[in-house]
């Protein structure tokens, strides 16, 4: 009897261990996979692309890019992506979102993008070192940085409505583009995400 009980226990243990075996599958980075309903890499990329596309949409047949280009003799506007404030309770990798915004602007070909303040400090340190240690024909010139014409800023807000095992997650991303010289807001945009999450309940 004890032997049968022992064998049965071993069988149950082996089945349990088999059920807990980790299984990893490589998927495309572009594939949308929502496990928790929280902000993820697809949301970051999708929202960035949508907002940058919004910023180029013309109001009354004209937009800030074309107005700037006309007023500057054909030069493309230069943009710096500034602060993104996370006002939500979710963990949002803001730096990833900033990179997605920069990527979308650069890939558009309509504007130029300059480095952030922290990145510029590192570049300036390297440039200063070059003045002392690099050869004259390879060192970067001083005071030749491109100044930004506009700064992109904004915030992320989120809320959740939960009842039992079901919930609705709502996320709103607001962005503003402001002239560095006049402080005029040349564009205000918003993109929203809404997700329904149904968490099954398991009963014993």
What does each model-found stretch correspond to?
Residues 50-63, 75-134, 182-188:
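N-terminal segment of the mature soluble domain
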Residues 1-20:
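Sec-dependent bacterial lipoprotein signal peptides
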Residues 136-139:
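Acidic/proline- and glycine-rich, intrinsically disordered low-complexity segments
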Residues 14, 76-78, 149:
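A residue-level signal for beta-strand positions that form part of recognition/binding surfaces
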Residues 5, 36-40, 86:
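Residue-level detector of alpha-helix boundaries and kinks
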């Amino acid at each position: 009897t004890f032997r049968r009980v022992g064998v049965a226990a071993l069988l149950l243990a082996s089945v349990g261990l088999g059920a807990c075996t980790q299984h990893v599958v490589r998927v495309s980075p572009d594939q949308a996979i929502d496990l928790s309903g929280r902000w993820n890499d697809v949301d970051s990329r999708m929202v960035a692309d949508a907002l940058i596309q919004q910023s180029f949409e013309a109001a009354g047949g004209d937009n800030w890019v074309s107005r700037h280009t006309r007023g500057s003799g054909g030069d493309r506007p230069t943009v710096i992506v500034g602060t993104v404030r996370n006002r939500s309770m979710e963990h949002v990798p803001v730096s990833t979102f900033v990179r997605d915004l920069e990527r979308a602007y650069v890939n558009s070909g309509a504007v130029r993008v300059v480095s952030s303040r922290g990145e510029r400090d590192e570049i300036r340190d390297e440039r200063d070192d070059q003045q002392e240690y690099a050869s004259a024909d390879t060192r970067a010139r001083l005071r030749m940085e491109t100044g930004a014409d506009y700064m992109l800023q904004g915030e992320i807000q989120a809320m959740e409505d939960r009842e039992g095992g079901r919930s609705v997650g709502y996320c709103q991303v607001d962005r503003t583009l402001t002239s560095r010289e006049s402080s005029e807001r040349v564009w205000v945009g918003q993109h929203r995400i809404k997700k329904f999450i149904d968490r099954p309940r398991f009963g014993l």
